[in-house]
């Protein structure tokens, strides 16, 4: 009960600050759930989506969502889209299978880093990056290497606060079909919770961890949340719609 009350108080205090937020990658699974949860919790006075195309929503709750359409190959021409946001969430990402090796690096490293640079220049104070369990710039695996590289590069920008989330396998029902992922999700879903939670995490838990974290005051400039910490924070009492 005390934890629930404390979290509710943190949220209320955060709302009173009338902060603005942008989301990169709102068309993806994590970004889509993040947007939904942000609107349900009402944490921000202004919500902006930055993406390569305008998204369509039928629900009334989305009517005040702002959208900035940009060309990620010419992001400098769209610097204004990144101006005036207090908080940023970056959920950009693709796969080597979908985009090829060069395309994957371009999206997951180059687009993310350039977006972070423009966000910093535009006044963003708290940048949140969705990365991956095992991210390591020295890894022999391209995926983990790129994730580790971009983590380090964004840290060099010296945001007032920089939060990196390293979830395991994301458990969700993708709108986009990715061969093999369905089997992986079924595999983890059949395992004991104690084992599966160390290597996987539901998308909604990641999103709630992000939002529970953003309302908590922190002295550290950089914070790294691994899969277990994401589970713990995402399942904190009061993490549902207020």
Curated annotation (Swiss-Prot):
Q: Name one Pfam family in it.
A: NAD_binding_10
Ranges for region Required for interaction with elongation factor EEF1A1: 2-25
List UniProt keywords, sorted A-Z: Acetylation, Cytoplasm, Disulfide bond, Host-virus interaction, NADP, Translation regulation, Tumor suppressor
CC per GO annotation: cytoplasm; cytosol; mitochondrion; nuclear envelope
Q: Name one GO biological process term.
A: apoptotic process
Gene3D superfamilies the UniProt entry points to: NAD(P)-binding Rossmann-like Domain (3.40.50.720)
| Location within or outside the cell | Cytoplasm
Main localization is cytoplasm
Record: active site: 143, 147
Task: Report the residues modified as N-acetylalanine.
Answer: 2
Bilayer-crossing regions? none
InterPro entries according to UniProt: NAD(P)-bd_dom (IPR016040), NAD(P)-bd_dom_sf (IPR036291)
Q: Keyword Chloroplast, does the record have it?
A: no
Annotated residues that bind NADPH are located at 27-30, 52-53, 92-93, 143, 147, 170, 178
User: Where does tissue-level expression of this protein occur?
Assistant: High levels in liver, lung, skeletal muscle, pancreas and placenta. Moderate levels in heart and kidney. Low levels in brain. Not expressed or low levels in variant small cell lung carcinomas, 33% of hepatocellular carcinomas and neuroblastomas. Levels are reduced in the heart of patients with hypertrophic cardiomyopathy and failing hearts.
Annotated function: Represses translation by preventing reactivation of elongation factor eEF1A. May also inhibit nuclear import by competing with nuclear import substrates for binding to a subset of nuclear transport receptors. Has additionally been proposed to act as a redox sensor involved in cellular oxidative stress surveillance.
Question: Assembly and interactions?
Answer: Monomer. Forms homodimers during oxidative stress. Interacts (via N-terminus) with elongation factor EEF1A1 (via middle-region); the interaction is direct and competes with EEF1A1 binding to guanyl-nucleotide exchange factor EEF1B2, thereby inhibiting GDP for GTP exchange and reactivation of EEF1A1. Interacts with nuclear transport receptors XPO4, IPO5/RANBP5, IPO7, IPO9 and KPNB1 as well as GCN1L1/GCN1 and LRPPRC probably through their HEAT repeats. Binds NCOA5/CIA. (Microbial infection) Interacts with HIV-1 Tat (via activation domain).
Q: What is known of its domains?
A: Unique C-terminus confers high proteasome-dependent instability to isoform 2.
Q: What is this protein called?
A: Protein HTATIP2
Encoded by which gene? Answer: HTATIP2
